[in-house]
């Protein structure tokens, strides 16, 4: 990789997304399910097929549910088993985050998952963005041996969090990678890179795909109260990924 190249990680909600992202030139993918909930653990079948079909690295999400990051003992047990299974089935890394009820990092539980990850990449996700003391939290992650932190700079989107992201990158040095992610689009890529000096970015690149199998009874819905169209779903857009990669050359 060229020294000044910006690494592009595409957030994917399915193996189909990951394959399209790779075709478009992505350097790495984050593999999840349920992106509407912020990303949950993908199925083991997805991870097995990802290992068989992808040439680029993929980082598997381990998150048992939406709605926060303070987990019960039962949820923690599931996360530990998912981490072991994802590693055994070939994931290049694990992305996760566990907080205490006050929003601080649950260091004891994070260390348990970190130990199971072993020599694979350990990534702390945007749970970081609700921690009360970002620099204390970053010190904890460094001490635990995390590879990388995904963050929007404790704001809703990266463009809003640019000042903190820049400070985090400067503070981290070469002790941990800082990966800006959240609200990055084709039109603001350059702004993010120039304002922060980041060496990698994390974003989605979707288009709408139709599934006509439900058109016969359009009044039947399967989702929650928002009732998204049942004949549509989002899939990674290979051409948009290629534009993103091309913009950063």
Region spans (language model):
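Hydrophobic faces of well-ordered beta-strands that scaffold small-molecule active sites
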Residues: 6-10, 29-31, 58-62, 94-96, ...
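N-terminal pre-domain/capping segments
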Residues: 2-29, 34-41
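A short acidic, helix-capping loop that chelates divalent metal ions and anchors anionic groups
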Residues: 66-71, 227
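Catalytic cores of alpha/beta
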Residues: 13-23, 70-82, 129-144, 168-170, ...
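Glycine-enriched alpha-helix->loop->beta-strand junction motifs that scaffold or abut catalytic
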Residues: 24-29, 54-57, 90-93, 116-120, ...
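C-terminal alpha-helical cap/extension of soluble enzyme domains
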Residues: 173-249
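Active-site-adjacent beta->alpha loops and helix N-cap segments on the catalytic face
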Residues: 16, 35-56, 74-77, 98-118, ...
């Amino acid at each position: 990789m060229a020294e000044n190249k910006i690494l592009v990680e595409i957030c994917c909600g399915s193996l189909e997304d990951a394959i399209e992202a790779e075709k478009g030139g992505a350097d790495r993918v984050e593999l999840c399910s349920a992106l509407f909930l912020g990303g949950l653990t993908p199925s083991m079948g997805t991870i097995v097929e990802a290992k068989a079909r992808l040439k680029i690295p993929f980082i598997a999400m381990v998150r048992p549910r939406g709605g926060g990051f303070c987990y019960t003992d039962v949820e923690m047990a599931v996360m530990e088993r998912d981490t072991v299974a994802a590693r055994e089935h070939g994931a290049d890394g694990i992305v996760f985050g566990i907080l205490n009820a006050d929003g601080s990092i649950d260091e004891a539980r994070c260390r348990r998952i970190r130990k199971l990850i072993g020599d694979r990449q350990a990534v702390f996700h945007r749970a970081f963005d609700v921690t009360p003391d970002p620099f204390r939290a970053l010190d904890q992650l460094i001490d635990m041996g995390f590879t990388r932190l995904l963050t929007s700079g404790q704001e809703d989107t990266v463009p809003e969090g640019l000042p903190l992201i820049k400070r985090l990158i400067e503070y981290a040095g070469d002790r941990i990678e800082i990966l800006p992610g959240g609200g990055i689009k084709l039109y603001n890529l350059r702004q993010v890179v120039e304002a922060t000096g980041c060496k990698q970015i994390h974003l989605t690149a979707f288009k709408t795909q139709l599934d006509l199998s439900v058109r016969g009874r359009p009044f039947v819905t399967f989702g929650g109260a928002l009732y998204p169209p049942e004949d549509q779903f989002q899939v990674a857009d290979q051409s948009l990924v290629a534009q993103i990669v091309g913009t950063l050359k």
